[in-house]
A protein has these predicted regions:
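Glycine-enriched alpha-helix->loop->beta-strand junction motifs that scaffold or abut catalytic
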Residues: 172-178
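Flexible mid-to-C-terminal extensions adjoining Fe-S/redox cofactors in radical SAM and related proteins
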Residues: 5-11, 15, 357-358, 363-482
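Conserved alpha-helical substructure of the radical SAM core
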Residues: 25-158, 162-166, 174
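Hydrophobic faces of well-ordered beta-strands that scaffold small-molecule active sites
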Residues: 46, 116, 154-156, 178-180, ...
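Short, acidic, Ser/Thr-enriched surface-loop or helix-capping motifs
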Residues: 352-353
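Cysteine-centered iron-sulfur cluster-binding motifs in ferredoxin-type domains/subunits
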Residues: 50-57, 346, 398-400, 404-405
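Radical SAM enzyme [4Fe-4S]-AdoMet core and its adjacent flexible, acidic
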Residues: 101, 187-206, 210-342
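Active-site beta-loop-alpha junctions enriched in small/polar residues
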Residues: 121-123, 159-161, 183, 229-231, ...
């Protein structure tokens, strides 16, 4: 198989010592290569923090623990700040989108649709601004660029403690993607997700979810995602299994669209809550059994299987994603930001805080703003952001790490109090072991030529790429010519 030989050859090439001579750009390259490509990307996400108010005081929340600059307060985003934020996003989005050729506009709108993601605090404590922002963004002249209201996509992340008929009707009629925080059954959830009086919130949240499912079951199957935090003080498997069983996740009768699991974020920890031991022998044996199971299915059965088994689909997609990380064609085909261990800060994900400051994304601690809605993104601040980040990477242990270009390191996750902190020695070892395991699984897959081709065919027959499953920054240069 020609592709297999190319990829394996590239893996060997990537691990030569000469590859490590420059893993990040120098100061001139930041100016000439990174910043000059800033306008080549179209925003995939626009998030506004509508309020700092929250109905809960979650024990693992950075707000509750008053770390860095994030904290609970009674502050809400005002109408003027909201409109300035939307206007800025409209300008950035349309300036990029107008360069897209007519033949690719449908695909770009599917991957990076215009819209808003509402964030808090608890966003529904400022429901009025949510409604106003939706109405305002839709009032702008998008039609001049061939963009219609049907192209818009909205989402909201909520603890779902606030529910009334108006909110539910807004979600359902607007086809709003709803991400509900639920950490498991009552025992697991109520250990951390509590009200100010320390009373658990599970009974209210689960009751509200039941109301929504009863009111609009089809909406829930298409637009509702349950997301859980794998907190350090709970038994994660019990919580996960409880959610999967309650909502029929990964079955044909699933009551919601999907389930997502995240580790608890802890200051100065890159991999909090993640396993420290990897039983590689068992993992590879189980994966070999899975490959044999997949190989026994015809392509059409694989397509149906992946529609249900989203966890397995995600693992296979991650292995196929190694193609681009290995970059077996040529280095120029790579996204320059991906090659240099980051995303296009300030444009791929435009995050606006309640005060109108623009930050890299909602994963950060708000300690390094990139601009504000009145003046826009400051290229000087972005340059300083990259300079400080790359200085840490260049002068730290990353420089000699064989896994650096496969690492899932993220500047937002490493940012604390305005400074970048690298993972500790043990965390890096876990990362390397995971990457090594992924590469071994990938080579196992490559050695099964027939299955590899069947999986490629199955992927092509799955629903087209959308903002939900497209993981790369969107470079519009790829879509300028038909």
């Amino acid at each position: 198989m020609k592709k297999k030989n190319i990829i394996i050859g590239r893996i060997k090439q990537d691990f030569k010592p000469s590859v490590f001579q420059q893993i990040v750009p120098n100061e001139n390259e930041i100016e000439n290569l990174v910043l000059n490509k800033f306008e080549e990307y179209i925003p995939r996400k626009f998030t506004i923090e509508v309020t700092e108010k929250c109905t809960l005081r979650c024990k693992y929340c950075l707000f509750s623990n008053q770390l860095s600059e994030r904290h609970h307060s009674e502050i809400e985003m005002d109408d003027l700040t909201m409109k300035k934020a939307v206007d800025y996003y409209y300008l950035i989005y349309t300036n990029a989108f107008k360069r897209v050729s007519n033949g690719y506009r449908g695909e770009v709108l599917s991957i990076a649709p215009p819209g808003i993601s509402w964030w808090g605090g608890e966003p529904f404590t400022n429901f009025e601004l949510i409604k106003k922002s939706k109405a305002y963004i839709e009032s702008l002249p998008w039609h001049e660029y061939g963009i219609e209201k049907d192209n818009f996509v909205y989402s909201v992340v909520s603890n779902f403690t606030i529910v009334n008929d108006e909110i539910l009707d807004f979600l359902i009629s607007g086809k709003i993607y709803l991400f509900i925080s639920l950490d498991g059954g009552e025992k697991e959830h109520d250990k951390n997700r509590v009200f100010a009086n320390n009373k658990g919130s599970f009974s209210r949240v689960s009751h509200n979810i039941d109301i929504l499912i009863k009111k609009a079951p089809e909406y829930c199957r298409k637009y509702v995602v349950i997301q859980a935090v794998l907190a350090n003080n709970i038994r994660g498997n019990q919580g996960v299994n409880s959610i999967i069983k309650t909502y029929g996740i990964y079955t044909l009768d699933s009551k919601v669209l999907n389930f997502q699991l995240y580790p608890q974020k802890v200051k100065n920890q890159y991999l909090p809550g993640k396993r420290k031991r990897i039983n590689e022998k068992k993992e590879l044996a189980d994966f070999d059994l899975l490959l044999n199971q997949l190989n026994s299915m015809p392509v059409q059965n694989l397509v149906q299987f992946f529609k249900i088994q989203k966890g397995i689909l995600n693992e296979i997609e991650n292995l196929f994603a190694l193609d681009s990380k290995i970059a077996y064609e040529n280095s120029q085909s790579c996204c320059i930001y991906k090659k240099w261990l980051t995303c296009p800060a300030g444009v791929d994900n435009i995050f606006v805080s309640v005060s109108g400051d623009i930050h890299i994304c909602n994963k950060s601690d708000y300690s390094f703003k990139l601009g504000d809605v009145s003046t826009g993104i400051s290229l000087n601040r972005i340059k300083r952001f990259y300079s400080q980040y790359y200085h840490v990477i260049r002068n730290g242990k990353c420089h000699s790490c064989w896994a650096v270009h496969f690492c899932g390191i993220c500047p937002a996750a490493l940012l604390n109090d305005g400074k970048f902190h690298l993972p500790n020695k043990d965390e890096c070892e876990v990362v390397r072991k995971n990457i090594c395991l992924q590469l071994k699984k990938y080579i196992m897959l490559l050695n099964k030529d027939e299955l590899y081709e069947k999986l490629e065919s199955a992927m092509l027959n799955l629903p087209k790429r959308t903002f939900l499953n497209y993981r790369e920054p969107l470079n519009i240069r790829l879509y300028e010519k038909d």
